[in-house]
Amino acid sequence: MAVNLYDYANQLEQALRDSDEYKAIKDAFSKVKDNEESKKLFDEFRETQLSFQQKQMQGEEIPEEDLAKAQEQAQAIEKDENISELMQAEQKMSQVFQEINQIIVKPLDEIYAD
């Protein structure tokens, strides 16, 4: 019987949706969206991050004033309880993804280990 990896991937997706880590992100993001100030800070910071990523991908340097603005945004975000909660939840989920990735690549690691 052939193994359908996509079936397992879909099961993993559902398990992630059912996980406490996913629910924590969902709840934390709802708090950010429901608070006007938190949402504004979050959106501005995401815009800045995306802009930086685009510039880096295009090989452009990021101007000092943009870096200073990003620093100010980061400091404001650290003080926002809702965003801090979201970031902590994201870190926990990131750890889960790293651990799952290690499990997924284990068969390949074993092949190349010899």
UniProtKB/Swiss-Prot annotation:
In Pfam terms, one family for this protein is: Com_YlbF
Q: Which domain of life is it from?
A: Bacteria
What organism is the protein native to? Staphylococcus haemolyticus (strain JCSC1435)
The entry's family comment says: Belongs to the UPF0342 family.
Q: Where is the signal peptide?
A: none
Name listed for the protein in its UniProt record: UPF0342 protein SH1117
- Which Gene3D superfamilies does the entry mention? YheA/YmcA-like
